[in-house]
């Protein structure tokens, strides 16, 4: 299985980069992982709603340019479906079984994901109704993907 994480923004904090590196290494046993980092657009202080929408669409165009035609796209979105870890593992497993071995997870920037990217998404997933920094969320997503593969394989880790 090929997993691509397309994300807006760079990771500045060493402890987050270390965690990403650790989970990326662990995932190497289960899938080919590719993390694509896109430049986040600067949002001016007191930006209007229209200015924010323009920024989201610009970031969205960068995301769309990285999505390949054969990718099953899962957008991480507050309006998406919430799953348990077991349901998430089952969903990923089912994608592989049904001929979707190329999965792209999309993490938007601080303003979220553009309408054009949400329209391209095959599935919208929400981890929580809470808001998380997108840098931290990348670690959370990698951990859940790793947990999912451990569940699929029946290996100890998940409790």
Swiss-Prot record:
SUPFAM superfamilies: alpha/beta knot
Annotated compartments: Cytoplasm
Reactions the enzyme catalyzes: pseudouridine(1915) in 23S rRNA + S-adenosyl-L-methionine = N(3)-methylpseudouridine(1915) in 23S rRNA + S-adenosyl-L-homocysteine + H(+)
GO molecular-function terms, A-Z: rRNA (pseudouridine-N3-)-methyltransferase activity
Subunit organization: Homodimer.
Catalytic EC class: transferase
Main location: cytoplasm
The enzyme's E.C. designation: 2.1.1.177
Keywords linked to the UniProt accession: Cytoplasm, Methyltransferase, rRNA processing, S-adenosyl-L-methionine, Transferase
Similarity section: Belongs to the RNA methyltransferase RlmH family.
Protein name: Ribosomal RNA large subunit methyltransferase H
GO cellular component term, pick one: cytoplasm
Transferase is among the record's keywords: yes
Cross-referenced InterPro entries: Alpha/beta_knot_MTases (IPR029028), RlmH-like (IPR003742), tRNA_m1G_MTases_N (IPR029026)
Main function: Specifically methylates the pseudouridine at position 1915 (m3Psi1915) in 23S rRNA.
Sites where the protein binds S-adenosyl-L-methionine: 108, 127-132
């Amino acid at each position: 299985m090929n997993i691509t994480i397309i994300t807006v923004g760079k990771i500045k904090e060493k402890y987050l980069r270390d965690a990403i590196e650790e989970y990326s290494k662990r995932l190497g046993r289960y899938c080919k992982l590719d993390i694509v980092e896109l430049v986040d657009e600067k949002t001016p202080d007191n930006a209007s709603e229209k200015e924010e929408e323009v920024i989201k669409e610009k970031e969205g165009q960068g995301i769309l340019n990285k999505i390949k035609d054969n990718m099953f796209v899962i957008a991480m979105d507050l309006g998406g479906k919430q799953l348990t870890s077991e349901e998430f593992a089952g969903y990923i497993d089912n994608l592989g079984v049904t001929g979707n071995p190329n999965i792209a997870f999309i993490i938007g920037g601080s303003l979220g994901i553009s309408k054009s990217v949400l329209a391209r998404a095959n599935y919208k997933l929400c981890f929580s109704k809470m808001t998380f920094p997108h840098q931290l969320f990348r670690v959370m997503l990698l951990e859940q993907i790793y947990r999912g593969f451990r569940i699929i394989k029946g290996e100890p880790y998940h409790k």
